[in-house]
Amino acid sequence: MKLTCVLIVAVLILTACQVIAADEAEATNRAIKRGWFGEESSCWWCTGFNKCCEAAAVCQSVNSACP
């Protein structure tokens, strides 16, 4: 019984670590696309529920189409 509990806890911890690592990787990819690491980007400041339309150099709602 103790071994089962230990295994369940270990699986939960490993799953949580994978989720955290995936979130960090996704955030890093978004940051690179937005130019936070030295890359030139016209809308590095575009955050939240907004998206960057590089061609028009505008930051607008994710629900709007890029011009």
From Swiss-Prot:
Compartment(s) of residence: Secreted
Keyword Ion transport: no
Molecular function (Gene Ontology), one example: toxin activity
Primary localisation category: secreted
Keyword Secreted: yes
Disulfide-linked positions: C43-C53, C46-C59, C52-C66
Signal peptide: 1-22
Keywords: Disulfide bond, Knottin, Neurotoxin, Secreted, Signal, Toxin
Tissue occurrence: Expressed by the venom duct.
GO cellular component assignments: extracellular region
Function: Probable neurotoxin.
Free-text note on domains in this protein's UniProt record: The cysteine framework is VI/VII (C-C-CC-C-C). The presence of a 'disulfide through disulfide knot' structurally defines this protein as a knottin.
Similarity annotation: Belongs to the conotoxin O1 superfamily.
Name of protein: Conotoxin Cal6.35
Source organism per UniProt: Californiconus californicus
